[in-house]
Curated annotation (Swiss-Prot):
Encoding gene, per UniProt annotation: XYNA
Hydrolase is among the record's keywords: yes
Region annotation Disordered: where it falls in the sequence: 248-284, 493-514
Enzyme class: hydrolase
Annotated active site: E141 (nucleophile), E223 (proton donor), E386 (nucleophile), E474 (proton donor)
Family under the similarity heading: Belongs to the glycosyl hydrolase 11 (cellulase G) family.
Start-end of Polar residues biased regions: 248-272
Domain CBM10: 523-563, 566-606
GO biological-process terms attached to the record: xylan catabolic process
Protein name per UniProt: Bifunctional endo-1,4-beta-xylanase A
Secretion signal span: 1-18
A UniProt-annotated Pfam family: Glyco_hydro_11
Amino acid sequence: MRTIKFFFAVAIATVAKAQWGGGGASAGQRLTVGNGQTQHKGVADGYSYEIWLDNTGGSGSMTLGSGATFKAEWNASVNRGNFLARRGLDFGSQKKATDYSYIGLDYTATYRQTGSASGNSRLCVYGWFQNRGVQGVPLVEYYIIEDWVDWVSDAQGRMVTIDGAQYKIFQMDHTGPTINGGSETFKQYFSVRQQKRTSGHITVSDHFKEWAKQGWGIGNLYEVALNAEGWQSSGIADVTKLDVYTTQKGSNPAPTSTGTVPSSSAGGSTANGKKFTVGNGQNQHKGVNDGFSYEIWLDNTGGNGSMTLGSGATFKAEWNAAVNRGNFLARRGLDFGSQKKATDYDYIGLDYAATYKQTASASGNSRLCVYGWFQNRGLNGVPLVEYYIIEDWVDWVPDAQGKMVTIDGAQYKIFQMDHTGPTINGGSETFKQYFSVRQQKRTSGHITVSDHFKEWAKQGWGIGNLYEVALNAEGWQSSGVADVTLLDVYTTPKGSSPATSAAPRTTTRTTTRTKSLPTNYNKCSARITAQGYKCCSDPNCVVYYTDEDGTWGVENNDWCGCGVEQCSSKITSQGYKCCSDPNCVVFYTDDDGKWGVENNDWCGCGF
């Protein structure tokens, strides 16, 4: 087989605005790139997804399936055209890749290259190792290549046996964009299967261990994903089965240790109702469920605590840390992956409702707040920052000098401090803490988080790349409870319409769902559903909130539109009918509205 020079490209880390919020996109959604749109990235069903196209030209699409499945199609048969689509698990660079005792991946795919301009393509496991706080360890982009067309590496390597198959392993140096932001020279690690295939099991952790045996530096694991990539080519990859897991099938899962992503987070909603506990040597659980990150943590000074996950981002935390230097936290929200500066996000909103109280104290305190970090990846002169937007507190008022500002119609005192301690980078260092403290306490409401970032920037405070936005319950030498019954984090303001991806309207599926319709009903506002929210299942639901978009209810711990959804006039003007069931199954959404299927033809969902 001929040897062709192969160009490995990393997707430049720019998050498409419409793809964040509420945990990302949903099954059945088709994301497209081309004509100036180069990337979509987010989380759906508990699995990360990304589609990326170089700005050299071409086009492509990625349709999300249930779980981690997806279908990718690309046409990048142009000079230096490069496309990729991948799904998997984000591990958040919490610990070294070889510290995970087991990571497995099962997949089935149909993959073929349909065109080429002296190019190539491949189907592979893909990810990164970050060198957070690890001296002498390189930044690494890794590939476990299972199938390919028109490419065989000519690099010197070594043959190893993993999962009963022969793989050639080698490494290269590459200069280009990275997940840290900017461009730099980094390592690429490869395992290339000598017998191609498009389905099977991969013990990913065995590849990491084999690379380590060769003396290759192993950093903190950022992600494990199945990737379809094309260079100056066109093709299709239909991944009909994909599972990534950290507990070997047939074995009993061990308790989660510090920094471990629980295997239960891999399946989207499988951890709903699960109670995580800390104490007696167990000090942390961390992962993703229902598209939202979660963490419970307890200092090793003593005490205990628990966190019970609800649907969406909701949770209940209870803690007993009324001991000397006892410290507890529990939080849920969205991970933004330090992809770009916090102030580069036009809008980030957070809605919440909680019952919060401190039940005991050993000269301690507690607080309910929005919490996160700014990382200083590739940003000279910008500090590492831990930030707090404090909404309610007990037995704590900072005496720091600050400035009063008005955000969301309320007064906040803003100030910063220096602090030395453990960080998300690993190890201990001195970093900045930014604070916004609400002067009128509350336990529910709306927070325009992005306005706090912008206000801090106005003061000349350094703003780094946004790592996360989470609602946090924290106790210091205290005991208490926080029951968060409503929590939503989103990047499209309510009342605006997020971008949609075009898709062909072709289907042979039919479905019927019946639901009685009250004689007297209100119409659910199209301005609400245009933001991705559903209409409440009860057309006569209780109205919690009213604004220019319509009337808002709450269902399954998330916002919904009160009333029956309207059938779009843009659909009926094309000659299609409104579906006879006003609560029909939505097969497709575009600028015209929501489309259902009835009698083997398209119809408009609503009434």
